[in-house]
């Protein structure tokens, strides 16, 4: 999602609050909870899940392994839910022609670098760069080459842009910033 006028362009970045992350976190939570319940029911000898009797799974070694997988899955699921709630990777890109400034903001993990805020002048932007890697998993990433700071990614590596979409986005941004486009 973006908002643009003659002088200002604001591009909102989604971050980790994507539908696929919600689905994976939910599926992983339910699966690991099921593994933990099966392992626990084999330990106490009572049916906590009525799908099959607990006598079919003995605690040593199957119950221990299922409990371990359940606990490990709950840890991974809680990590996913934390990244979703913190919106890691979310933020915005703000290009202001009137003031001649570019501001890039992203949310990070809690701690010292929770708020990642980059600010620089538009005249320091050397080019907009498109990096294309073809193959089994094609990757197209848009970078902004800044003097003294190197290449700053503007799109995520997991966004699946078609060649036409990434070229269109790069052309619009390069036109707005009045800088050349490089393709690698």
From Swiss-Prot:
GO cellular component terms, semicolon-separated: chloroplast thylakoid membrane; photosystem I
InterPro entries: PSI_Ycf4_assembly
Keywords assigned by UniProt, alphabetized: Chloroplast, Membrane, Photosynthesis, Plastid, Thylakoid, Transmembrane, Transmembrane helix
Subcellular location: Plastid, Chloroplast thylakoid membrane
Record's keyword annotation contains Aminoacyl-tRNA synthetase: no
Domain of life: Eukaryota
Membrane topology field: Multi-pass membrane protein
UniProt xrefs under Pfam families: Ycf4
GO biological process: photosynthesis
Family: Belongs to the Ycf4 family.
Task performed by this protein: Seems to be required for the assembly of the photosystem I complex.
Name under which the protein is recorded: Photosystem I assembly protein Ycf4
Gene name of the encoded protein: ycf4
């Amino acid at each position: 999602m973006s908002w643009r006028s003659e002088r200002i362009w604001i591009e909102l970045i989604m971050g980790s609050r994507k539908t696929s992350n919600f689905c994976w976190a939910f599926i992983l939570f339910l699966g690991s909870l099921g593994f933990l319940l099966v392992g626990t029911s084999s330990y106490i000898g009572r049916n906590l899940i009525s799908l099959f009797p607990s006598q079919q799974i003995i605690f040593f070694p199957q119950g221990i392994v299922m409990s371990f997988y359940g606990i490990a899955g709950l840890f991974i699921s809680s990590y996913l839910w934390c990244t979703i709630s913190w919106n890691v990777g979310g933020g915005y890109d703000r290009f202001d022609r009137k003031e001649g400034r570019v501001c890039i903001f992203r949310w990070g993990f809690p701690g010292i670098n929770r708020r990642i805020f980059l600010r620089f002048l538009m005249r320091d932007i050397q080019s907009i760069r498109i990096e294309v890697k073809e193959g089994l998993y094609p990757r197209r990433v848009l970078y902004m080459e800044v003097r003294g700071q190197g290449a700053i990614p503007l799109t995520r590596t997991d966004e699946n842009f078609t060649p036409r979409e990434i070229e269109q986005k790069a052309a619009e941004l390069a036109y707005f910033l009045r800088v050349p486009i490089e393709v690698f």
